Each structure stands twice: as structure tokens, then as C-alpha cells.
């Protein structure tokens, strides 16, 4: 598999740069090693042909999922502020053969979705109002969807939102950097909303 990344950046001035790009990626096959790792139909036939008795309490399942292929298109800006910075980005991601590991009550079922996509935006802001105080806020806002997933453990779930992918994630923190008796340290208070 050959993947690529192509990006362009333009410096508007000393404080602002804008960029855009496209990237592809690959994730190798995955194996289900949970207690629900049942052999598929061809594996059961092979076991029986080899003289291995088929267990009556086992069912035909999915032991592995094929590889994923991803493509991401992104545009954004990096802005330096007098006492910090702001990064913002818009993106559109598509994954063909998305590896879904779905909880089914007693274990997990591994399967490939036809396609899963997510578009959205993210930001990262750091501001230091005083020399020893840093304020940080970052966020990601997604619209994830199974574009095509006809072979899930629950039937055709195309058009639904994948589980365990939050649509909104916001992180904030306040950091106090201090020096006391020759010791450097910091105290941080942070919060995650998802």
C-alpha cells in the first residue's frame, strides 16, 4: 500500500499562516482476541476437515477484520497572539473498511464497515495573561456517520452515528508555573467535557 501527504502553507504575515492538504493512511487487519472470537464459516469447515471436532456451543463469527484505508482533507490557520496562539482547522475524513469493534452484551464483535466518515472542526487556544499563568482551551466538533455498514452484528446500520466517538470534546486548563526555594514546579487545574 502506498500512502501520501500533500500540504501547502502560506504565511500571510509574521503572525498568521494558512494551510491546506490531503493525506491518506492505512491500518492493517485486526484480530478479535476476546471471548467472542468465533471462527468464520471457512475456518469451521477447515477445522472439521482436519479432524478437529466442532464445539456445539460455538457459533460462526468474525475472528478478524480487513484493513482500513483513510483519506483526510484539511484546511486551517495558525495564529500567533501577543501572549499565546490560536490554531483552527476544518477537516473531512473518510475511512473505507472502518474496523468496528462493537460490544454485543457478552463480548465484542469485530467487523469492517463499508465506509465511515467524519467532518468537523477543531481549535487549540493558549493565552498567558501573566508570566506564570497559562490558560488553555481546545475543542473538537465532529459529525461522524457510518456511510455504509450493512454487515454489522445488528444488521444494516448505515446512516447511524458510530458508538464511542463523541460529537463534542472540549478541554480547558489553568496552569500556575512557580519557583520556590530553587524548585521549579507547576499546579494545573483541568476539565474535560465530552
Feature locations, PLM:
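Gram-negative outer-membrane beta-barrel transporters
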Residues: 85, 90-94, 111-194
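Outer-membrane beta-barrel translocator domains and adjoining extracellular loop/strand segments
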Residues: 1, 31-37, 98-106, 142, ...
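Membrane-embedded beta-barrel scaffold of Gram-negative outer-membrane proteins
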Residues: 11, 17-21, 44-121, 140, ...
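Residue-level signature of outer-membrane beta-barrel architecture
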Residues: 8-12, 24, 67, 77-79, ...
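A surface-exposed, glycine/aromatic-enriched loop/edge motif typical of exported proteins
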Residues: 26, 32-46
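Proline-centered helix-kink/hinge sites
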Residues: 4, 14, 29, 64-67, ...
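Surface-exposed extracellular loop regions of Gram-negative outer-membrane beta-barrel proteins
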Residues: 1-11, 16-17, 23-27, 91, ...
